């Protein structure tokens, strides 16, 4: 359940009854400190100012009219007009019981939307590197969260599968008399790419042939299309290995590469011209946007077709947005693309809106993210200054986690050890990223991410094993817990209330695309359980009623930690 939404509704009704205009924002928030209750309504002061009243006077009137019978044990005014709400422990206990029995921890179903999520987007004929990590795992966390809430999510892997590089690769493969591209691994393709680029730069005849192959490919030449398809298939097969290792839900069926929109591009250019949005300028086709100014203060020109007839990324992104609305039926589109692309996307979407391709009622959201940096504060590189391949990074994560887990569990069977090591190693890399606000750069640090304390995956995974170990020791499951839940201790109440805030957290993550909010919540929850575990006897409680109540709190904690980590794409283990 969403306590914040429930209290907001109740406070809003009281505000209106007290004379506030409809739609007044009650600003109900979770309290930062227990002394201020479980929730605070902070909107009274701003509303009182509009009404020409003293804030405390309005707050008193609101409390008088506020119907929280059975929900709150106490409501009080603090400071100049804050309203502190203390939840009734019996009510909290009953809601924990409901959450334990309900599907999805009691999270209410939403009105489902069709939401397109654009993420990962590696290039064909190149191995994935650390630069692809953030888009891939943040986007996948968004997808998992939205699907958990009941939305129809369409994954869109906008791979770079078109352009002059394919002319070079096809020409070079032919030059090497190696048409059997399906036998090559991606490492061979990378080398081919480098050699093709070198030859393209140094050999004008080769460059002409490569450009000719681009034209042939674009005009549908069968041989070129076959070779292109092989290059795409080899790349995506290799990328799938990375996705599977990362526990990311993308498959080959989610590939919607740049080539998908090729047939739309001439139509879009013609349509933008017909609508008077695009004009000819020095042989190119340009859209001038008043919203953006060049260095001379004039409307900025955005090229959508070059002199030679070629199209640009902007043209593709216009087509892409149009396709996602008209063909996929999107109610909302999220783009997990790094912050350096922000202006480019904004310009493309400005054109999309002006042309009427996507109505304003359908949000196009750039969920941008910062860079992964090394300890020196510079972009994360190998020791020699090269790009870090994603596969190498994951290999190292597993190797480091292996040493950590084997040291602590010398007798763990090999099969179990392998599973635990992979979950901890991959989880550590993902959680280190997801636990940081996506809009900022973050420092990649092996020691921090594999630490068994602090806001890390190993700590969270260990916290989960600690909870489930209670049930293993007791030899019981949920069906044995038949007595009603009672809350008598402050630490029980704090844990129970935090457990009931899961829906508020997951709703925020879904709305804002901020998985670090989920990480912070889970870390807080693990800390509250640790305090509860240390100060409240569970298996040796004073009474059977208290024992079962505490086991129920432990049970909901385990379920919430597991579900929360699952929305992040991080696996739990039964022991560490």
UniProtKB/Swiss-Prot annotation:
EC number: 6.1.1.19
Pfam families: Arg_tRNA_synt_N, DALR_1, tRNA-synt_1d
UniProt motif 'HIGH' region: location: 122-132
Disulfide bonds: none
Protein keywords: Aminoacyl-tRNA synthetase, ATP-binding, Cytoplasm, Ligase, Nucleotide-binding, Protein biosynthesis
Principal cellular location given in the protein's record: cytoplasm
Keyword set includes 4Fe-4S: no
Reactions catalysed: tRNA(Arg) + L-arginine + ATP = L-arginyl-tRNA(Arg) + AMP + diphosphate
GO biological processes: arginyl-tRNA aminoacylation
GO MF term (any one): ATP binding
A single cellular component GO annotation: cytoplasm
Localisation: Cytoplasm
Superkingdom per UniProt: Bacteria
Keyword Membrane among UniProt keywords: no
Listed HAMAP family: Arg_tRNA_synth (MF_00123)
PANTHER family assigned to the protein according to its UniProt record, in alphabetical order: ARGININE--TRNA LIGASE, CYTOPLASMIC, ARGINYL-TRNA SYNTHETASE
Family: Belongs to the class-I aminoacyl-tRNA synthetase family.
Assembly and interaction partners: Monomer.
Protein name: Arginine--tRNA ligase
Organism name: Yersinia enterocolitica serotype O:8 / biotype 1B (strain NCTC 13174 / 8081)
Upper classification of the organism: Bacteria, Pseudomonadati, Pseudomonadota, Gammaproteobacteria, Enterobacterales
